[in-house]
Design a protein with these regions (language model features):
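Catalytic-core regions built around general acid/base machinery
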Residues: 98-110
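N-terminal helical cap/lid subdomain that shapes the substrate entry/recognition surface
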Residues: 2-97
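Short alpha-helical
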Residues: 22, 101, 122-123
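A general structural motif
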Residues: 2, 110, 167-169
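Substrate-recognition "cap/lid" segment bordering the active-site pocket of phosphatases
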Residues: 87, 91-94, 114, 120-173
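Active-site phosphate/pyrophosphate-handling residues
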Residues: 60, 101, 154
Length: 174
């Protein structure tokens, strides 16, 4: 019998790709409006390439972009990028349709809920709180907890331990 449902966070409960895309585009447009002469489409590809090589949660992506583009970090452009990125992220950080309703339905039926995410702990928890999902989960395991990414069994074994359940009593979505 299923006693718990384990979810991935990004691109399962929320549209991480859309949020990241819109936030990066906002940042690039803002730097351009601040006077940085860039081609938005090419610059977008460059920023996404930095994320792909450094990790999707890389905090210094615009520093690297500016160093590559103009040879140094201009704080005017950096500030424009960071503020616009945060605003774009916040505006596009949304749960998929029916996520809250589905989670509430599972909870009301006595099903435990958990998250296994490859995101760093702080970023995962910020998204969970921002979406007002923090009170719904019995266990959350992030990369910082397990030091290994899916599909490694380590994060799954850790969440099973936190839930006090066996692999035969859970289902993973994501």
């Amino acid at each position: 019998m299923i006693k718990a449902v384990i979810f991935d966070l990004d691109n399962t409960l929320l549209d991480f790709i859309k949020m990241k895309r819109e936030a990066v585009l906002n940042a690039l447009l803002s730097m351009n409006e601040a006077g940085l002469e860039i081609e938005i489409e090419d610059s977008y590809k460059q920023v996404m390439s930095i994320y792909e090589s450094e990790g999707w949660e890389h905090q210094l992506v615009f520093n690297k972009f500016l160093k590559d583009k103009i040879g140094y970090v201009d704080n005017k452009y950096l500030a424009a990028a960071i503020v616009a990125y945060r605003r774009g992220k916040e505006a596009n950080l949304k749960a998929y349709p029916n996520v809250h309703r589905t989670l509430n339905h599972l909870m009301k039926n006595g099903i435990k809920l958990a998250i296994v995410s490859d995101a760093p702990s702080r970023e995962a928890w910020m998204r969970i709180y921002y979406l007002n999902l923090h009170h719904m989960f019995d266990a959350v395991v992030t990369f910082d907890d397990s030091k290994e990414r899916k599909p490694s069994p380590k994060p799954f074994n850790l969440v099973l331990k936190k839930l006090g359940l066996s692999k035969d009593e859970v289902v993973m979505i994501g």
